[in-house]
Every structure is written in C-alpha cells, then in structure tokens.
C-alpha cells in the first residue's frame, strides 16, 4: 500500500480538517495514511514548531486557521517545500460571501460562540447521559429520538454522537423474556429507531465484552437462539408501529447516526408547517 502523510493544522480542535481528511481517504483503498494532529495553533511560536515537524515529515497539509498572518506563513512555507497546503473551508466561505453579498469578516474571535446551538448541544449531551440504557423512562417525552435494540448494538455511542449534533437521544435495551417499557403502547411524537445486528456478529461482540469483564457464566447473553430472538423481536416491535429499523452489522457509529439524522429531519420537515 502507498503511504501518505497528512498534517492537520488548526487553531481549534482539528475536527473539521480530520473529518475532511477521512471523507477524502475513504475514496482510496490503496492508501495507508498517517495523520498528524496539530490543534490549538494560535500564534507564530506554536506554528514554528509545527513547521519544523512538517519539514521533517513531508506530506499534505490540511488547515483551518483564522489568523491571516499565520495562514500566509503556513502556505508560503509549504509552497517553498513544494507540498500541498489546503484550506478546508476557504472555498466554502468565499462562495457564501459571493452568494450572500456579505463581505468576509476580517476580525476573528477564537472563543467558541456561546449561542443557542451551543447550549442545545450541551443539553442534548446531558440528556443522552441521563437517559442511557433505559434510565428515566418517565422523561421520554423530552427526547428527540429514542433508540431501542438488544444489548451491544451501539445504542450508547450512537446516542452520544447524535447528542453532539444537538439531538436529545434516549436508548432502551431489549432483553429476552423481560417486559419492554409500556411507552411502546402509547402514541408518541418522538422518532423511535430500532437497531439490530447479525446474531453471529453480536455474539462475537458480547463474548469479547464478557472476556474483558472476566465473566464466565452468562449463557443467555451469548446463546445464538436467544440473541436471534432478541433481534427478531425488536424488528417485530418496530414493524408493528412503522418505526424504522437499521441493521448496524457493517455500519460505523457515524454511518448509523447519519441515517438516523436523515430519517429524523425528513420526518421533521414533512410535518413542519
């Protein structure tokens, strides 16, 4: 495989550059990337340290830096080394400016914007933590999304990922031969999504979990027939109520969350007046 070095340089968390890099790398199966993360680069001294690293390990540079002088220094340095230096969002900003007719603001503030979106995200994260694994079922009416599924079908990490996108998400496990919460008998406005997985894959995940916890006796947890029944029962519950079901067998958490968000916003837009 061809090796590729990528330097992610940002005056913030490098998350934007990282997401862009991973999206691009997904198109190349024969590349073996090595990513270097350089977050919180907000002055010339910090940038100088990064430049020395870039010089010692040539590769593509992806950056999100607001300060004009730092950008100039970085791009000039890369130009002299004859390596690509790409601004992840400059093209987007330029097109927004052209389309809206509003000039790009020159003064940048490094502080996060403490607006409604910021606090909505904090509230969503808090909600996801407090309503994990079937907790506080009496507060489901405050959720945007409710996930149901057998244990170890990525309900918790998916809930947290959705919360980081501002969506209050509760998750409820389905356990074989245990009564399911009676909320399913009610007419609710929240989006309910069932998560299922290939039984063999789920057994592998559960066995790994038990080994990590050094638990030797929990036969029902990894019994094929029971695991299969759990997945089938979740499908049945959802199909009877026209709730969507997602098979997460071959999906990453990001992919699962993206599908859920698409369903959520399609539903929201459909009923928006």
From Swiss-Prot:
Pfam families: Kinase-PPPase. It is an enzyme of class 2 (transferase). Coiled coil: none annotated. It comes from the Bacteria. Keywords: Kinase, Nucleotide-binding, Serine/threonine-protein kinase, Transferase. This is Putative pyruvate, phosphate dikinase regulatory protein. It catalyses: N(tele)-phospho-L-histidyl/L-threonyl-[pyruvate, phosphate dikinase] + ADP = N(tele)-phospho-L-histidyl/O-phospho-L-threonyl-[pyruvate, phosphate dikinase] + AMP + H(+); N(tele)-phospho-L-histidyl/O-phospho-L-threonyl-[pyruvate, phosphate dikinase] + phosphate + H(+) = N(tele)-phospho-L-histidyl/L-threonyl-[pyruvate, phosphate dikinase] + diphosphate. The keyword Nucleotide-binding applies. Bifunctional serine/threonine kinase and phosphorylase involved in the regulation of the pyruvate, phosphate dikinase (PPDK) by catalyzing its phosphorylation/dephosphorylation. HAMAP family: PDRP. GO terms for molecular function: ADP binding; ATP binding; phosphotransferase activity, phosphate group as acceptor; protein serine/threonine kinase activity. Its EC number is 2.7.11.32, 2.7.4.27. Belongs to the pyruvate, phosphate/water dikinase regulatory protein family. PDRP subfamily. ADP binds at residues 149-156.
């Amino acid at each position: 495989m061809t090796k590729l070095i990528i330097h992610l340089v940002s005056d913030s968390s490098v998350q934007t550059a990282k997401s862009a890099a991973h999206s691009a790398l997904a198109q190349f199966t024969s590349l073996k990337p090595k990513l270097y993360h350089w977050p919180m680069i907000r002055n010339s001294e910090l940038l100088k340290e990064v430049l020395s690293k870039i010089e010692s390990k040539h590769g593509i540079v992806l950056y999100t830096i607001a300060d004009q002088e730092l950008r100039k220094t970085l791009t000039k340095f890369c130009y002299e080394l004859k390596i690509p230096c790409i601004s992840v969002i400059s093209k987007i900003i330029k097109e927004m400016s052209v389309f809206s007719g509003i000039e790009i603001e020159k003064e940048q503030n490094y502080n996060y914007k403490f607006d409604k979106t910021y606090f909505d995200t904090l509230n969503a994260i808090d909600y996801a933590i407090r309503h994990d694994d079937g907790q506080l079922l009496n507060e489901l009416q405050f959720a945007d999304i409710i996930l149901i599924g057998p244990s170890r079908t990525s309900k918790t990490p998916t809930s947290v990922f959705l919360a980081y996108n501002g969506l209050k998400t509760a998750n409820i496990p389905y356990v074989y031969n245990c009564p399911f919460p009676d909320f399913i008998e009610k007419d609710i406005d929240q989006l309910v999504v069932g998560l299922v997985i290939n039984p063999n894959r789920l057994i592998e995940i559960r066995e790994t979990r038990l080994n990590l916890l050094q638990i030797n006796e929990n036969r029902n947890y990894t019994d094929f027939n029971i695991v299969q029944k759990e997945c089938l029962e979740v499908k049945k519950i959802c199909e009877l109520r026209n709730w969507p079901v997602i098979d997460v067998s071959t999906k990453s958490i990001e992919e699962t969350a993206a599908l859920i968000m698409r369903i959520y916003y399609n539903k929201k837009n459909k009923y928006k007046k």
